[in-house]
């Protein structure tokens, strides 16, 4: 199936957010940033090696017009989350068997799905959900696979209880991946999203939620810069506490593994390369207290 044509989809109420003179819009793209995405683009997508950098920049600027998230401006969509998780070898092996289904929530341009497809996972067993149809369309363009990818890509709002496309996949997923997703919201919104994830997963022991997100040693609601409001940043204990609430409200039980990791490079990546020597804080990011929260919840 051919991907729809991508057109500018700016939110007129947030025109201020699309300016490019901000720290989270990078003009240069290094080989280090491209990283493991280069062989995927060259060998899976058939982008000529000498064209990879300009191809990424061109498609990135189209994605910026859909919505100017930091992960777009900083080329964060090139960074693969799942392959760096300790559970990845086991999850990959189970997916390669062709008997398990996988859903990436907040999938952006579907980079995790293409990585798994490139690694030998049957693409028809892969699902992606994102709020913005434009990102899904741009993913087809970036990876040049609109005629070959068999994955199911859904434009949906996880907070919309009436979403028919999400209802159609409830109870059908073995592994849900959430990379840099939950940290976008406040506590109550995270609980709501987590309960939706519970419904998406198969209602049986062994179903998995895996991922990572930005956290803070001092858990709490954190103000964001400018007009961006606030969101809840967890430490390991508060993230476990939230899932205790989710378990109680859904009548489910979970084996919980959470790690709180100090990672200065993660801070740089997520803030657009802010110089740690020159800042004490950056919006809701603090170089001394920001942590990477890595988690795996397995249904018992």
Swiss-Prot record:
Pathway: Secondary metabolite biosynthesis
Entry keyword Lipid metabolism: no
Pfam family, one: Methyltransf_25
Top-level lineage group: Eukaryota
Catalytic EC class: transferase
GO-annotated biological processes: methylation
Entry-linked InterPro entries: Meroterpenoid_MTases, Methyltransf_25, SAM-dependent_MTases_sf
Biotechnological utility: Phomoidrides A and B (also known as CP-225,917 and CP-263,114) are potent inhibitors of Ras farnesyltransferase and squalene synthase. CP-225,917 and CP-263,114 inhibit Ras farnesyl transferase from rat brain with IC(50) values of 6 uM and 20 uoM, respectively. CP-225,917 inhibits squalene synthase with an IC(50) value of 43 uM and CP-263,114 with an IC(50) of 160 uM.
Catalytic reactions on record: phomoidride A + S-adenosyl-L-methionine = (-)-phomoidride B + methanol + S-adenosyl-L-homocysteine + H(+)
Binding-site positions, S-adenosyl-L-methionine: 130-131, 157-158
GO molecular function: methyltransferase activity
UniProt cross-references to Gene3D superfamilies, sorted A to Z: Vaccinia Virus protein VP39
Keywords: Methyltransferase, S-adenosyl-L-methionine, Transferase
The protein's Enzyme Commission number: 2.1.3.-
Quaternary state and interactors: Homodimer.
Family to which the UniProt record says this protein belongs: Belongs to the class I-like SAM-binding methyltransferase superfamily.
Function summary: O-methyltransferase; part of the gene cluster that mediates the biosynthesis of the antihypercholesterolemic agents phomoidrides which are dimeric anhydrides. Within the pathway, phiE catalyzes the acetalization reaction that converts phomoidride A to phomoidride B. The pathway begins with the highly reducing polyketide synthase phiA that catalyzes the formation of a C12-fatty acyl-ACP, starting from one acetate and 5 malonate units. The hydrolase phiM is involved in the release of the C12-fatty acyl chain from phiA.
Protein name from the UniProt record: O-methyltransferase phiE
Gene: phiE
């Amino acid at each position: 199936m051919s991907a729809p044509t991508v057109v500018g989809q700016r939110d007129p109420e947030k025109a201020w957010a699309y300016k490019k003179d901000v720290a989270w819009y990078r003009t240069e793209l290094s080989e280090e940033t491209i990283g493991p995405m280069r062989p995927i683009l060259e060998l899976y997508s058939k982008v000529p090696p000498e064209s990879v950098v300009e191809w990424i920049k061109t498609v990135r600027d189209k994605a910026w017009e859909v919505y100017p998230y930091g992960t777009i401006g900083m080329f964060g969509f090139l960074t693969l989350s799942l392959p760096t998780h300790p559970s990845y070898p086991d999850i990959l092996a189970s997916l390669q068997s062709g008997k398990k289904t996988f859903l990436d929530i907040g999938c952006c341009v579907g980079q995790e799905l293409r990585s798994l497809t490139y690694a030998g996972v049957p693409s028809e067993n892969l699902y992606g959900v994102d709020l913005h149809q434009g990102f899904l369309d741009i993913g087809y363009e970036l990876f040049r696979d609109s005629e070959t990818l068999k994955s199911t890509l859904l434009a949906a709002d996880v907070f919309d209880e009436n979403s028919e496309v999400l209802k159609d996949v409830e109870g059908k997923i073995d592994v849900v991946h959430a990379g840099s997703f939950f940290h976008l919201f406040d506590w109550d919104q995270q609980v709501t999203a987590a309960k939706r994830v519970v419904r998406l997963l198969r209602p049986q022991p062994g179903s998995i939620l895996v991922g990572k997100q930005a956290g803070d040693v001092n858990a709490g609601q954190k103000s964001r810069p400018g007009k961006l409001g606030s969101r809840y940043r967890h430490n390991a204990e508060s993230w476990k506490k939230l899932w205790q609430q989710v378990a109680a409200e859904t009548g489910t039980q979970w084996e919980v593994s959470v790690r709180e990791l100090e990672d200065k490079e993660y801070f740089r990546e997520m803030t657009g390369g802010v110089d740690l020597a020159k800042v004490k804080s950056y919006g809701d990011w603090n170089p001394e207290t920001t942590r990477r929260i890595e988690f795996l919840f397995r249904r018992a």
